Amino acid sequence: VTVDCSGYPKPACTLEYFPLCGSDNQTYANKCTFCNAVVEKNVTLNHLGEC
């Protein structure tokens, strides 16, 4: 599974909850917060859902 993070980072994210588990073992609330971390910290996707 891959997440398309083109167009990120964004200055603000919505509050929708669709959790993604990052390679840093942190649960990101949604694609926007995850993709911001990808751009800022070079995180990758471990799996969909909470860590």
Curated annotation (Swiss-Prot):
It is found in: Secreted. Gene3D superfamilies: 3.30.60.30. InterPro entries: Bifunctional_prot_inhibitor, Kazal_dom, Kazal_dom_sf, Prot_inh_Kazal-m. CDD domains: KAZAL_FS. Coiled coil: none annotated. Residues 3-51 form the Kazal-like domain. Keywords: Disulfide bond, Glycoprotein, Protease inhibitor, Repeat, Secreted, Serine protease inhibitor. Glycans are attached at residue 42. The record marks 15-16 as: Reactive bond 3. One of its GO terms (cellular component) is extracellular region. Disulfide bonds join 5-35, 13-32, 21-51. GO terms for molecular function: serine-type endopeptidase inhibitor activity. Avian ovomucoid consists of three homologous, tandem Kazal family inhibitory domains. This is Ovomucoid. It comes from Nothoprocta perdicaria.
